[in-house]
Amino acid sequence: MTSPATSKQIAPFFSVAFRPFFLSGSLFSVLAILAWAGVLNAWFSFEPYANSFWWHAHEMLFGFAAAIVTGFLLTAVQNWTGLTSLKGRSLMLLWLLWLAGRLVLAFDFGLASGLIALIDLSFLPVVAFVLGRLIFKVKLWRNLIFVPVIALMTIANILMHWGAISDNPELVNQGNYAMVMLVTLLITVLGGRVFPMFTANGTGTKKVEGIPLLETLTIASTVLIALIYTIGFSLPVVIQAGLLIFSGVCHFVRLVRWRFWVTFKTPLVWSLHLGYLGIPVGFILMGLHYLTGSLQLSTVLHGLTIGAIGSTILAMITRVSLGHTGRKLQAGRLMALAFVLLSFSFIVRVFYQYAGSDYAYSMTMAALLWGLAFGIYSLSFFPKLTTKRL
């Protein structure tokens, strides 16, 4: 039984989906990345489900990124539909389901592999159901795209678990790459909808309208890339490289049209542009990997995971957390520092090999910089996300 004071403190935390999932997802990413650094440097013994490499890849995507996506979509759907999303006990149960997945994958409770997979796999389908139910109620077909994307994320998760259970690294990689591309697709769609508006509002400039052909090519090429990696369809190397580079160029032109140069005095906006830059950089580097073979795929993939996904997430959760708790849309110096630290994490992780840096040292530095960036967010926003809206 909790005291009235405790109840008042806990209640706001489960009042809207972004509160528990943004805070818990961010804190989890700090713990997960530090655990990964510890394993790399043999600082301590850690034997999660499958193996540490599988756990790191899986948990930064299906533990961290999936939590943030859930918090964002289940909050945004209320604005889209005018209907109430999960809150209170139902939201707490969904959060506990997510937490259960993290625990059974990190620690050995003596459970069978199939049961562990089932616990983890059950989270995203519930999210898709809740989201889809609200969208269908008001027939808001424009936003229905997010439901099949989450369904495909579930398939990617199945592939990773199937690969772990059957000891098939190809399935693991397929699921891993698929999830990266699906989250990138979400950023592509949402970014196109809101980044020009955020740029205009934040800088006091005119909103840039999208060019229909450019928007179609950018989104369609990203959808195609996501489907290819999810299905595991093998294309000729030149075609796959060409598609990635073409899409990367489309993304870059799109970003330039949003006028990143007007954002330099507004951290809450330039951080979004900096995060989006990770998409063209990541796609083009991946294309060069397939063309030349001189770039490691696991390395250039972090152009997307840190540069695009991590950076965009940090910028978006900062903005949403401020706006939805009644604060001014001003990031402040500490969060601006966090944005910069995460950018350095991307640079160190992706380009270490060209500077001749030691592998373990570079990986550790990238992990620590990530931990600092999301640690700053977690500490700064903990009181805001656990107390009532102003």
Listing of model-derived features with the role each one plays in the protein:
Residues 1-390:
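Hydrophobic alpha-helical transmembrane segments of multi-pass integral membrane proteins
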